[in-house]
Amino acid sequence: AGPRWTKLETYRVLDGAFPQQIRACDGYIVTGSAAGVYEEHSWIDPLMAFIREAYDADIPLLGICFGHQAIAQALGGEVVKWPDGWGVGVKPTRFERPPVAKAELPEDAVVKLIYFHQDQVTRLPEGAERLASSDFCDVAGFTLCTTDGVQTVLCLKGHPEFDAGYSTALLDSIESKVGTDRTKAAKATLAKKTDSPLVAGWIKQFFTTSAQRLGCAA
């Protein structure tokens, strides 16, 4: 077997762009968004339907922040705007178990990621298992498996793709919403090292293992 290459396709669902066939890709990532899953946008319901179709077809799904919430809501969970406001900056998250079979966790099971959210999952879909939590966010991640134990869903509240520079600019752009004191405190955390490389490895392992076991990898 030669080297494998990963090809990424981008679909701007907010513009109504979805894959023409559910099996157009071996797996899907539902990314972050400025929108809330409970808001009335023309693309929200089609996205919910797409997530359900992919899940029913056992196609691996990764949800990050908004994606974490969208997958939860689409599959029967509940998402609300959190009354305590925004969770921003680098935050430690306690993992209850490895996010993927045989994945490595730090010795203390605490993973640091950058967070940007004002919404939270308050009820998980039926059959989902909580993966992680923090002092600010009770459901900071969850997983779902098929009836024969193949993991098809990995959802994370934190942003492994964010870095300090981008996060600083984003905080500046939403300071009026987050509040000056909370923005200042969040910026102070951005000097901390995150575990994004570790989480990136988990994500690669999740898609590779799930797609191979389900027989949907090319």
Regions found by a protein language model. Give the residues of each.
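Cysteine-nucleophile active-site neighborhood
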Residues: 25, 31-99
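Amide-donor transfer/coupling interface in amidating biosynthetic enzymes
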Residues: 12, 95-218
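Short glycine-/acidic-enriched loop or helix-start segments at secondary-structure transitions
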Residues: 20, 39-40, 72-74, 125, ...
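N-terminal beta1-alpha1 cap of cysteine-dependent amidohydrolase-like domains
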Residues: 1-57, 180-218
